[in-house]
Regions:
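Conserved non-catalytic scaffold segment of RNase H-like nuclease domains
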Residues: 2-138, 194, 199-201
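A short, structured active-site edge motif that brings together acidic residues
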Residues: 50-54, 150-167
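Acidic, Mg2+-coordinating catalytic module of metal-dependent nucleases/exonucleases
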Residues: 119-136, 140, 175-253
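Short alpha-helix plus adjacent loop in nuclease-associated cores
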Residues: 157-184
């Protein structure tokens, strides 16, 4: 990519990030799980996901929260004809209440981490992160913490937009920066072009077989972050870019 040099420590050290939400409406929907896969020299060294327990927050309409989560689960697990998709959605109202952490504390921890990542010269990897995860996270930081942390150009590598560009034959322009490229690809409707992480990109590249992946765990934030890492490493391998040390892959961490 033109302006690849803007990614600091590229492509060795980064944090793959994913979120699960109650829907796609920024300013309305809530982040209910944040997951990450931290990578050093191309190898995953830490993977974790945290549920955000909005059930204990008085300002949140609990009936709305339960209904939104039930709707997301239905949309993931059943198609428009009501037939099972074979997919699973793992975030429920009861799980938030039983296993979730204080959402403000979780958001604060991740915002502080992102600030440190910027200072340390790492970058983020996410699937559709340019249009969805990054702005959704920044919106939550702004609303619930009163502090912005917008992702800067060259701080996020969007595997979703790379996959979409590959399938839609969208090339780079000489003046492209990472963000301008991801923005431009994101605006293209490209009817019929598939690039979803679990439903297309991972199986299309045979990564579910190569890494013996349990795809029933997709739509869990930490697992999807790990899938983003594997897809990013696949792009590096395909481009002939090699990392120092042993190749990434193998069993999930």
């Amino acid at each position: 990519m033109a302006a690849t040099h803007k990614f600091r420590n590229f492509p060795c050290d980064y944090l793959a990030v994913d979120i699960e939400t109650t829907g796609v409406e920024k300013g309305l929907d809530l982040i209910v799980q944040i997951g990450h896969c931290a990578v050093v020299n191309g190898l995953p060294v830490d993977r974790s996901g945290t549920l955000l327990d909005w059930t204990a927050v008085p300002s949140i309409d609990q009936r709305w929260l339960a209904d939104r989560l039930a709707l997301v689960k239905k949309r993931v697990e059943f198609d428009r004809q009501g037939q099972p998709t074979g997919k699973h959605y793992h975030v429920t109202y009861d799980r938030l209440r039983a296993e979730g952490a204080d959402p403000i504390a979780v958001l604060r921890a991740y915002r502080d981490w992102f600030v440190k990542i910027r200072a340390d010269g790492l970058f983020l990897v996410s699937h559709n992160g340019n249009q969805f995860d990054a702005p959704f996270l920044n919106g939550a930081f702004s609303v619930f913490l009163g502090e912005d942390h917008p992702v800067l150009d060259g701080e996020l590598f969007d595997t979703g937009m790379v996959e979409k560009a590959l399938r839609g034959n969208l090339g780079l322009w000489a003046e492209d920066t990472p963000k301008s490229f991801f923005d431009r690809v994101g605006r293209q409707p490209l009817k019929g072009v598939r690039w979803a992480l679990d439903a297309f990109a991972i199986p299309q590249h045979g990564l579910h077989v190569k890494h013996a992946l349990d795809m029933s765990l997709a739509h869990t934030a930490d697992y999807d972050a790990y899938l983003c890492h594997l897809l990013f490493q696949h792009y590096l391998d395909e481009s002939g870019r090699r990392l120092p040390g042993p190749a990434a892959g193998g069993a999930a961490v």
